[in-house]
Amino acid sequence: MKNSFVNVVVAGLLVSVGWAQDAAKGSTLSPSQAVLESWNDIGRKLIAMAEDFPEAKYDFKPAPAQRSFAEQLLHVAGSNDLFTAVAKGEKPADDESRTNYKTKAAVVAYLKKSFADGAAVIKLKGDAGMAQTVVSAESHETLQVSDLAYGLIEHSGEHYGQLVVYYRVAGMVPPESRPKK
């Protein structure tokens, strides 16, 4: 009786381990998929903020020396454009000035386009392309495309954190911090 019980428990554990391994295989992302997921996640958060923040407060600065809310978003979008251009082997454009994007709608559209363009390049590159090397337009160092992408994802995350402070100082709650409906 005792041996039968032990055999059943061991058999059950082996089946469970097999199922867990099969499930893990199915959920493992390829390198380019992992980059794309992170890229899209921070993009979603920043776009939600850009769409949510009142247009009347788009030029709000917590302190005079800081960028405005709009300028922060434009800086992120311009940095995304830098990634896209470098990954494609092109010269980056430099048009993130607030004078080029006067309305909330224009800022939001540019931010959305910058994340969409970056996502398209990541998809186009795939795993092999993520391992290709490029020269960073900012630091002039040679990096893999995936490292450049992760650097920009981190950069966007840093600005997301700064914009959370803008929300709080303006007496608002950022979209990600609100209770889920």
PLM feature spans:
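Surface-exposed helix-capping loop/turn segments at secondary-structure junctions
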Residues: 52-58, 122-131, 168-174
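N-terminal beta-strand motif that seeds the catalytic metal site of vicinal oxygen chelate
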Residues: 26-38
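Short, contiguous alpha-helical
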Residues: 36-40, 44-47, 57-96, 136-181
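Bacterial N-terminal signal peptides
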Residues: 7-17
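Boundary at the C-terminal end of the N-terminal hydrophobic targeting segment
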Residues: 18-22, 26
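Acidic/histidine-rich alpha-helical segments that form the ligand environment
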Residues: 38, 102-136, 143-158
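Positively charged n-region of N-terminal signal peptides that target proteins for export
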Residues: 1-6
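Feature for soluble, non-membrane regions of globular proteins
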Residues: 23, 120, 177-181
